Design a protein with these regions (language model features):
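A short beta-strand-to-loop transition that corresponds to the Sensor-1 phosphate-sensing loop
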Residues: 119, 157-162
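Helical "lid/switch" subdomain of P-loop NTPase nucleotide-binding domains
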Residues: 55, 82-86, 91-94, 99-106, ...
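Short glycine/serine/threonine-enriched helix-capping/active-site loop
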Residues: 73, 158, 185
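Nucleotide-binding/hydrolysis machinery
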Residues: 1, 6, 11, 19-27, ...
Length: 221
């Protein structure tokens, strides 16, 4: 991707607009200026706390899939077996304690929409291989299942890690990185956006006042 896709210089304006619940048109205008409306996998990079999940939601809301489901899976929060069942679903009797009728995974539930894979760098090699197959042709099998399933799902992923270094170390598949990194956004940390500190502080103050039922306060210099 070109450099203009690799950085959103006004990413915090997206956060401010979302926090104030401005209409979707404003978010769409901000994103349209920085990201092509291409229905392709998107990789969001940035340090912890830069708003990667917020941006994933905004990208979904500005896409042609906006009226369809959006689901999130944090790859660092679940062990491999649970993450596999959550993403791909499982067939009846797949394991002890499985629901009698099986359970659809996020890919099935999100058909026509978007799945956001947060902390994708923490995904195990086994799950990386299953995800790669899905990205190749949209097909997958539930855990313990024999039937091939298909789903039309856009994958948005995010990471704070250097995936290229992980590829060199052998802990992340290079072919999967190519599939995930069709479009890329690099989110700058707030320390590189000092002009946004004031507006963000106002947003947080408004939120705190609303929660406590107090009149709107003002920040002093």
């Amino acid at each position: 991707p070109s450099e203009e896709y690799r950085r959103i210089p006004w990413i915090w304006r997206v956060a401010i607009a979302a926090g104030k619940r401005n209409d979707a048109a404003e978010l769409r205008a901000i994103l349209d200026a920085s990201l092509p409306q291409v229905d392709a996998p998107l990789l969001i990079r940035g340090e912890t706390g830069t708003g990667k999940e917020l941006v994933a939601h905004a990208c979904h809301a500005s896409s042609r899939r906006s009226g369809q489901p959006f689901f999130t899976l944090n790859c660092a929060a679940l062990p491999e077996s649970l993450a596999e069942s959550e993403l791909f679903g499982y067939a009846p009797g797949a394991f002890t304690g499985a629901l009698r009728g099986g359970k659809p995974g996020l890919l099935e539930l999100a058909d026509g929409g978007t799945v956001f894979l947060d902390e994708v760098g923490e995904m195990s090699p086994y799950l990386q291989a299953k995800l790669l197959r899905f990205l190749n042709d949209g097909s997958f099998r539930r855990v313990g299942g024999e039937r091939e399933l298909k789903a039309d799902v856009r994958i948005i992923s995010a990471t704070h890690r250097a995936l290229e270094a992980m590829v060199e170390a052998g802990s992340f598949r290079q072919d999967l990185l190519f599939r995930l990194d069709v479009l890329q956004l690099q989110l700058p940390p707030l320390r590189e956006r000092p002009e946004d500190i004031g507006p963000l502080a106002e947003r947080f103050l408004d939120h705190a006042c609303a929660q406590t039922g107090r009149a709107r306060a003002r920040l002093s210099a």
